[in-house]
């Protein structure tokens, strides 16, 4: 059975495998999506302006300049290309490929996809396997995995090879669908498609993000048998050791990379700096950070945000400010990731006035509405118990048209919980849950709210919290016991608790039975009657 037939036979499996994470799109032709391991520096929407080009380059008008200057997603890349052709200019495939690559680097995926789709319908443009791989990756990002899988299914047989499979694997990893990723990875091995380290890097990235560190050495051993690791492989391996604060293991990996004649990049030293800082190896951290600084340049702009964060972790105010000054002198406009890391850094260093000044600057120049940035200021107000100022700042956020995120509501919930204002706690907590499609349980917050409601004997509040948690799909025996303890504190009878628990598929334990017995001897109130 040939490779294409083998992949075809995997279609039912692929259709049931779903998403994934890594960065594979153009496996062999484009490394822009290769997984990069770096400390969490805030990410952000600011990438739009990161490498923005002028329409006129070197005194001449270019198609790339026009497309890169679109910025707003509502504007059409196809219209721009058509107009270019109508003006008598030629359009070359290699030029469009380069533009797509640039757009992907600055996260302008919609315009990149429009260009790919335009190329598909041009009879004079011959597409290669790598083009389909990039196209699939962009579909996954813009339209979702189902559309990407259908695109893969409809792809010409000869294009459904190593590059396309690696791109699909990337999508599965990004969407954290490990079963689908593992099934596809196994099928790629059977087809002989594991001929580069990129698919392995995607799988390593997934296992590390899931905390499955035991799978890392096994996969690297297999990788070395089939192909050669690159510096990204070693950075991922390094990250696995760093996640467990294993300095000795990380240093061995670093030395192995050097032995393999692989040049460490800024990510390598970023991971090492972060590890050394976490484990109080301050001098080693500073040395690693100096090595990282040597490798940071305009070409890898994303590194600056990481650099700022690492200086802050080491308590280096001068390093933070000097890096920020360098960024501002290197680029016309700062992006959200840079503002996020800088504001976070100065807050960490106790420079709240500077942080507020930076926020004012961001607010005046950015139109992204990225709630993560005002959340830093809001959280610091609340941490300082300056609740009234925090509330005024929240009003300012809303007036500016910034939509509160889940984190915004969670910050407010914690602040009001600290003040024991349970009415506002429950209001903000409900809005937090409503702001996300699927709520990830914050156990500490739930326990804190339950404890305060119990201490207050706040039956009405406890019942409202139970309703919110039922709506979010999070109900258990401990929550019902907390509710019963609240009734007991208030001296009130809790009615039909056993029936309610049965309806929620929650089992009674010994404490539940004792609390039901205890509260059954108490008075029936308006709340009790309403619930029954």
Curated annotation (Swiss-Prot):
Bilayer-crossing regions: none
One GO MF term: mRNA binding
InterPro entries: Pentatricopeptide_rpt, TPR-like_helical_dom_sf
GO cellular component, one term: mitochondrion
Gene3D superfamilies the record matches: Tetratricopeptide repeat domain (1.25.40.10)
Region annotation (Disordered) ranges: 35-56
Pfam families: PPR (PF01535), PPR_2 (PF13041)
Family under the similarity heading: Belongs to the PPR family. P subfamily.
Protein name: Pentatricopeptide repeat-containing protein At4g02820, mitochondrial
Organism per entry: Arabidopsis thaliana (Mouse-ear cress)
């Amino acid at each position: 059975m040939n490779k294409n037939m083998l992949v075809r036979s995997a279609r039912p499996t692929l259709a049931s495998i779903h998403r994934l994470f890594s960065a594979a799109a153009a496996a062999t032709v484009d490394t822009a999506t290769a997984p990069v391991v770096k400390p969490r520096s805030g990410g952000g929407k600011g990438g739009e302006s990161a490498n923005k080009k002028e329409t006129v380059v070197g005194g001449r008008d270019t198609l790339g300049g026009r497309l890169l200057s679109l910025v707003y997603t509502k504007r059409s890349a196809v219209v721009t290309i058509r107009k270019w052709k109508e003006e008598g200019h030629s359009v070359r495939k290699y030029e469009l490929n380069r533009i797509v690559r640039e757009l992907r680097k600055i996260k302008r995926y919609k315009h990149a996809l429009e260009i790919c789709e335009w190329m598909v319908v041009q009879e004079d443009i011959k597409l290669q396997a790598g083009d389909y791989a990039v196209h699939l990756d962009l579909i996954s990002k813009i339209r979702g995995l189902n559309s990407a899988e259908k695109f893969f299914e409809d792809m010409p047989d000869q294009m459904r090879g190593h590059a396309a499979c690696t791109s699909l694997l990337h999508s599965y990893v990004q969407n954290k669908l490990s079963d689908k990723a593992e099934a596809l990875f196994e099928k790629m091995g059977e087809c002989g498609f594991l001929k580069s380290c990129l698919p392995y890097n995607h799988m390593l990235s997934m296992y590390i993000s899931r905390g499955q560190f035991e799978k890392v050495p096994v996969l690297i051993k297999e990788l070395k048998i089939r192909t050669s690791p690159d510096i990204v492989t070693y950075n991922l391996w390094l990250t696995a050791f760093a996640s467990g604060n294993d300095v000795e293991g990380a240093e061995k990996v670093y030395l192995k990379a050097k032995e393999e004649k692989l040049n460490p990049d800024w990510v390598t030293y970023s991971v090492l700096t972060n590890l050394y800082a976490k484990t109080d190896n301050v001098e080693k951290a500073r040395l690693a950070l100096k090595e990282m600084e040597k490798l940071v340049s305009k070409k890898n702009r994303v590194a600056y945000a990481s650099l700022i964060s690492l200086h802050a972790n080491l308590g280096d105010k001068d390093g933070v400010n000097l890096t920020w000054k360098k960024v501002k002198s290197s680029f016309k406009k700062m992006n959200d990731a840079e503002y996020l890391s800088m504001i976070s850094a100065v807050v960490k260093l106790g420079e709240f006035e500077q942080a507020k000044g930076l926020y004012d600057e961001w607010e005046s120049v950015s139109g992204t509405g990225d709630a993560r940035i005002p959340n830093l200021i809001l959280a610091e107000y609340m941490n300082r118990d300056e609740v009234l100022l925090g509330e005024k700042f929240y009003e300012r956020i809303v007036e500016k048209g910034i939509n509160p995120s889940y984190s915004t509501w969670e910050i407010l919930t914690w602040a009001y919980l600290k003040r024991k204002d349970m009415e506002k706690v429950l209001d903000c907590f409900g809005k937090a849950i409503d702001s996300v499609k699927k709520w990830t349980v914050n156990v500490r917050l739930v326990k804190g709210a339950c404890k305060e409601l119990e201490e207050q004997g706040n039956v009405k509040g406890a019942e409202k919290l139970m309703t919110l948690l039922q709506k979010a799909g999070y109900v258990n025996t401990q929550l019902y016991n907390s509710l019963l303890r609240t009734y007991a504190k208030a001296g009130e009878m809790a009615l039909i608790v056993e029936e309610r628990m049965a309806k929620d598929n929650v089992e009674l334990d010994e404490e539940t039975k004792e609390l039901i017995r205890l509260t059954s001897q108490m008075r029936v109130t308006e709340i009790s009657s309403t619930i029954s």
